């Protein structure tokens, strides 16, 4: 009996709350979470409050004509909501974040003219949404607006729309047709991420900017045409688009062209991106090219080799990795060079110049060697090297970047000659099958590696013995313009075989320039060496350039 009175008392106390749960104060509607069925928002309402209908059981809502704002999460997680309509003459101006997100039964909606702003994730994860009408007064499609709307098959963006924001259509896996308006100015990062239904794509004139990875993982996309109006692009617009055969550019553009199906700047100075299905046994980068952009040949399995001009000034991260390249051909210059078949560059830091291991040919087999004198291994440097079985790291190595050994399927052994473990990031070994890899270090370094962040993830062995190999293989180049000989008095004698004046520079294997001189046509000269050892001799003239190893 006492329990009955207690329950009755609770009911009496809660009754006023239930009766007053739905409230309208100063035109703001709130507390509708207990509603179900059809609901018409009264004309006196000018604003629907945050979470007003959150997780309610309403099935249909008519938004009154005087509502100017629908606030954050107002209808979020309404699992039974099927229909939303707006009264004739709607004055709606603003929609907040997550307003209609996670409404799995909502199939269609027509937003009224006059709407000026939508918040992020407006229709996020509405798996039944098939038809959407947007007003011409809306100039920005917000971040994550239609993300994971998997039933959406076609979309038409109205005139007046200017910006497609980050991840706006990400995960719309069945989106097959997108009509972009002529007023679109920019397309943001991953705007069309994983749109598996897209087969062809033509970006309309007027678009000036497309950010990196805008069409990433459009895995069935075969052809794409970019507009002549395009002025700026990010890195790897079409990353992980394995069926893409060519990137075309409409004629008349001032900033971009397509050459061999590859996206270039109009003056050929920058190579931006090759499509995944681009084929070449040895692609020769144009002599005019000064920059190879980040990820330019990433995931291009049918490119077997590349020849890079000596005039290159910049090569971006992951530009030459995770593809089918078995070798790089490159004469080298003051900033970039090849050694042991791998690409290196000289970086300027607060501690001075540092040698960075940048890329190893993905199709190369056997052992990969990071040469003595190298300070850092770049992000993705050996990504996709499926056939390397071992890796040697020098005692001079200070650190390694992210995804360095991603997808190195046959890697079994890593030999590190550094007593102090090189610094790793949490992503350095990402994508590597760690249980199958053995780390070999000197006995005195064993405990340090076992305690070092991320090194402890690898099986350890203290079986490294002997001295670290410091000899360095130079690029396979024919030096026909310079003859040299070494005398026991420590002098290196040089003789020019060229008809042009050349610059001759001598380097240590860790990249330090020891001597530089100018050699006239067919002249002789000499350099006094500090000690016997291994050196790099670089000669450069207007006719040719070469690098070779000198062992004294």
Q: Which residues make up each language-model segment?
A:
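A recurrent domain-boundary module in secreted/ectodomain proteins
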Residues: 450-471
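A structural signal for leucine-rich repeat
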Residues: 427-432
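Bacterial N-terminal signal peptides
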Residues: 7-16
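C-terminal outer-membrane/trafficking sorting elements
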Residues: 471-552
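Structural signature of tandem-repeat unit edges
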Residues: 22-23, 33-47, 56-69, 79-94, ...
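Consensus positions within tandem repeat domains that build extended binding/scaffold surfaces
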Residues: 50-52, 72-74, 96-99, 119-122, ...
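Positively charged n-region of N-terminal signal peptides that target proteins for export
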Residues: 1-5, 552
């Amino acid at each position: 009996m006492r329990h009955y009175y207690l329950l009755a008392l609770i009911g009496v106390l809660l009754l006023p709350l239930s009766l007053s749960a739905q409230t309208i104060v100063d035109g703001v509607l709130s507390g509708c979470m207990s509603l179900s069925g059809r609901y018409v928002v009264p004309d006196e309402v000018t604003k629907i409050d945050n979470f007003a209908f959150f997780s309610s059981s309403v099935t249909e809502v008519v938004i009154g004509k005087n509502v100017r704002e629908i606030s954050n999460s107002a209808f979020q997680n309404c699992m039974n909501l099927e229909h939303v309509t707006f009264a004739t003459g709607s004055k709606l101006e603003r929609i907040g974040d997550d307003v209609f997100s996670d409404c799995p039964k909502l199939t269609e909606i027509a937003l009224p003219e006059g709407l000026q702003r939508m918040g992020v994730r407006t229709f996020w994860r509405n798996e039944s949404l098939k038809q959407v009408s947007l007003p011409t007064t809306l100039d920005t499609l917000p971040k994550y607006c239609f993300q994971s709307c998997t039933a959406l098959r076609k979309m038409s963006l109205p005139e007046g729309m200017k910006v497609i924001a980050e991840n706006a259509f990400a995960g719309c896996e069945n989106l097959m047709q997108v009509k972009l308006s002529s007023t679109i100015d920019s397309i943001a990062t991953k705007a069309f991420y994983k749109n598996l239904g897209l087969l062809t794509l033509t970006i309309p004139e007027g678009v000036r900017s497309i950010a990196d990875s805008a069409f990433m993982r459009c895995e069935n996309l075969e052809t794409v045409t970019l507009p002549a109006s395009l002025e700026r692009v990010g890195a790897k617009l079409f990353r992980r688009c394995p069926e893409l055969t060519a990137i075309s550019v409409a004629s008349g553009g001032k900033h971009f062209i397509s050459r061999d199906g590859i996206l270039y700047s109009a003056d050929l100075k920058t190579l931006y991106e090759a499509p995944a299905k681009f084929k070449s046994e040895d692609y020769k980068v144009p002599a005019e090219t000064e920059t190879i952009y980040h990820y330019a040949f990433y995931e291009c399995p049918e490119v077997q080799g590349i020849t890079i001009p000596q005039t290159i000034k910049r090569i971006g991260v992951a530009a030459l990795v995770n593809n089918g390249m078995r070798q790089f051909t490159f004469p080298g210059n003051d900033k970039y060079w090849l050694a042991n078949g791998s690409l290196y560059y000289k970086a300027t830091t607060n501690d001075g110049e540092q040698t960075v291991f940048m890329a190893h040919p993905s199709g190369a087999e056997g052992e990969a060697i990071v040469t003595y004198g190298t300070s850092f291994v770049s992000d993705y440097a050996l990504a996709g090297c499926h056939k390397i079985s071992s890796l040697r790291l020098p005692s001079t190595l200070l650190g390694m970047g992210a995804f360095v050994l991603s997808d190195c399927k046959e890697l079994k052994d890593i030999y590190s000659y550094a007593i102090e473990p090189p610094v790793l990031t949490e992503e350095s070994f990402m994508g590597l099958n760690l249980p199958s890899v053995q780390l070999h270090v000197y006995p005195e370094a064993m405990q340090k590696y076992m305690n070092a962040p991320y090194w402890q993830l690898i099986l350890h062995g203290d079986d490294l013995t002997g001295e670290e190999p410091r000899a360095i293989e130079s690029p396979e180049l024919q030096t026909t313009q310079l003859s040299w000989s070494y005398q026991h008095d420590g002098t290196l004698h040089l003789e020019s075989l060229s008809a042009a004046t050349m610059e001759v520079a001598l380097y240590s294997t860790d990249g330090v320039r020891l001597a530089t001189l100018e050699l006239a046509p067919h002249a002789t000269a000499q350099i006094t060496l500090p000690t016997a050892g291994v050196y790099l001799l670089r000669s450069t003239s207007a006719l040719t350039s070469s690098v070779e190893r000198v062992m004294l």
